[in-house]
Amino acid sequence: ETKPSSRKPAPPFTTSTLQQEASRKLGFSVSQTMAVAQKLYEQGHITYMRTDSVNLSQLAIGAAKAVICNTLGEKYSKPRNFATKTKGAQEAHEAIRPTYMDKESISGDKNEQQLYSLIRKRTLASQMAEAELEKTTITIAITGEKHTFEAVGEVIIFDGFLKVYMESFDDEKEDDEAALLPAIHKGDQLQRSLIQALSI
């Protein structure tokens, strides 16, 4: 059973979302994230890292579009403006983004390189096309058994922004519901690779 679906990219980073994502993806503490971001800012690699704005300048949006079109093709590009919902947000500052969008990597220690890459990918993804998915339920029957297994998740039809960046979540349940499944067809035979017993 399949239903068409789509997934939009997350906005570029604010201070708090950068801290959360760096913790989930890189294992950084809040203080570590801010110390590394401070270095990146001082070296001219990123915009100011203390902001609660998700806005990008028109210059940044144009630069992101150029990188996306040149590396992935026009179908992956979808320039967009994000609105900052926080009252009294520091609109004077942009979201946290690379100073130069076309700069894929930087010199520096491993932490600096990892955080820069995270910021760049999130920024580019925010300016990319939605992912087109099919919400899918797969029912697996076992020969000679009356019980069936069921897998619920999503199959990617067009990867869009997911080609560059996938957001993490703290809640495992949210992750499970959005699990990506391989494209299969009715009647396909599956090979057993692992059986794992879990208590619920």
Per-segment meaning from a language model:
Residues 1-38, 73-74, 107-200:
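Long, highly charged, low-complexity internal segments
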Residues 17-21, 44-45, 95:
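A general alpha-helix detector
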Residues 21, 49-51, 99-101:
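Short strand-loop junctions, especially beta-strand C-caps/beta-turns
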Residues 28-90:
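Extended, well-ordered alpha-helical scaffold/bundle regions in very large, multi-domain proteins
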Residues 46-48, 83, 93-97, 149-150, ...:
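Generic preference for hydrophobic/aromatic residues in regular secondary structure cores
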Residues 52-56, 102-103, 155-156:
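Conserved nucleotide-binding/hydrolysis micro-motifs of P-loop NTPases
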Residues 82-105, 110:
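Acidic, turn-prone loop/beta-hairpin segments
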